[in-house]
């Protein structure tokens, strides 16, 4: 190979035309090379012996981590605890928070890895898919011949408790019955909705009745409604066959898509609305959704977990919270602006807590 390349290089050099009265001197002879044995070149008199039979049997010096392994390692180990005092008086700068946020792997699902026929027709956004290891599988309470698929994931809560939340997309016309089946199957007593039905374009269909309506085999009734400045609370009943259950539905409308609320107060009041004895007594997960089920949904869940950490420990690990959320559902917390707003909201909550007592 080397000789062939050298041959091409010489062939490409321009030739020099010599005059008739000039004679070309004979080429100088290159000095003879002294052949050196391999042992001498290596500076050793010990013969080099290579047993080709041993090739391939030696363990590699180090293993190479795949991008997937690197992602999982980061999401499982990263953290940045902040005390109440630091969060209020010496918080990271917006630039530092942006840099920290951009280092967090999104952990989105590759569509090729989701081997579920026909799932695309039930996805509001083709690139936002449920992570397989934590996705909710429908048990098919009705006789409809369909898959167990719904674009939803179980999400861990404070202290890593399993299945505290279900994060899901805003229901579509062809997934409303699936949504209510999930509510029934998981014994859900609280739904938090963080989007309006339309924000320029459709973000979510009107999946609850004005008074009473059937969605598949589930009969939904409105029992009462109360409007607050930033959100509306509806008390529903869901009936399947002869069994009837109560469900609380909260529609928080003061949050534009891909942005943040004008102030943190309304979000903290929403969290307080959720912190009721009824919520604590119910064993089922809280269903949280916006349009895609990752941005505003992630912010609400992270805020509630962060408030619980501050109240119980006197510090909060917002980076660790977001990493835990993204392990369960890729892309939770969509923008650096939302990440910064999360810090601002939790700093406000920390300021509202009773003064810390000296140990």
Curated annotation (Swiss-Prot):
One matching Pfam family: Y_phosphatase
Post-translational modification: Oxidized at active site cysteine. Treatment with pervanadate (vanadate and H(2)O(2)) or with antigen enhanced oxidation of active site cysteine.
Recorded catalytic activity of this chain's protein: O-phospho-L-tyrosyl-[protein] + H2O = L-tyrosyl-[protein] + phosphate
Residues with PTM Phosphoserine: 44, 93, 143
Residue list for modification Phosphothreonine: 66
Binding, substrate: 257, 290-296, 334
Source species of the chain: Rattus norvegicus
Activity regulation comment: Inhibited in cells after FCER1A triggering.
Cysteine sulfenic acid (-SOH): residues carrying this PTM: 290
Family in the record: Belongs to the protein-tyrosine phosphatase family. Non-receptor class subfamily.
Function: May play a role in the regulation of T and B-lymphocyte development and signal transduction.
Record region (Disordered): 1-34
SMART domains: PTPc (SM00194), PTPc_motif (SM00404)
GO annotation (BP), single: signal transduction
Interaction with MAP kinases: annotated segments: 38-51
Main localization category: cytoplasm
Annotated PROSITE patterns: TYR_PHOSPHATASE_1, TYR_PHOSPHATASE_2, TYR_PHOSPHATASE_PTP
Catalytic residues in the record: 290 (phosphocysteine intermediate)
EC number in record: 3.1.3.48
The entry's keywords: Cytoplasm, Cytoskeleton, Hydrolase, Oxidation, Phosphoprotein, Protein phosphatase
Tyrosine-protein phosphatase domain boundaries: 97-349
Protein name as it appears in the record: Tyrosine-protein phosphatase non-receptor type 7
A GO molecular-function annotation: protein tyrosine phosphatase activity
Enzyme class: hydrolase
